[in-house]
Amino acid sequence: MSKTQSIIRGTLILTLAGILTRLIGFYYRIFLSHTFGEEAVGLYQLIFPVYALFFSLTCAGIQTAISRLTARYTAVGKSLQAVRCLMTGLIVSCTLSILCMIFLQQTSPVIALHFLGDQRCAPLLYSMAYAFPFGAVHSSLCGYYLGQRRTNVPSFSQLLEQLARVSTVFLLCLFTLRQHFTPNIVFAVLGLAAG
């Protein structure tokens, strides 16, 4: 397969996975609003700037570095160096994510009250922190496979991640309703860690 065909194929795979993921996400948001109500979904949306900030601190640049270095080492036949790069990135990213998880769990009441302006966000922030280590591993592995031009792996994992998130929240809600309790928006936050 030529380089141009490989790029086109990779782009198509990523695009298709992105479209499917967005479609699932579209119906997921409808499910959330019907299940938890507008106010709870508003609280859920309120924590996402904090999620984006901490995720950027733990993963964003590391994924790009792993991808670039893997591509460079793979191009010259140094696959062992590419694996070492992945391992180093995983260690750094996981360490940062665990530190951020602990920090966020310890300071969630303060962040909820003083930065988000709503104390009800504290348990959501606390639960959301569990997603960081999983996100670090996922991000590093995706960077590695993208660097190897194996776009099918990150595409499939993106789709699988969304399905795991939706399934986890749906099953938690179903179980809670069968026990005659009201589902809590914390389930949606735990879905972040599951996906």
Description of each model-found segment:
Residues G135-S157:
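Membrane-interface junctions at transmembrane-helix termini in multi-pass inner-membrane proteins
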Residues R149-N152, L163-G195:
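Membrane-interface helix-loop junctions in multi-pass transport and translocation proteins
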Residues L32-L53, R120-P123, I185-L190:
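Interfacial/gating helices of multi-pass transporter permease domains
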Residues L99-Q119, R178:
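Short membrane-interface helical motifs at transmembrane helix boundaries
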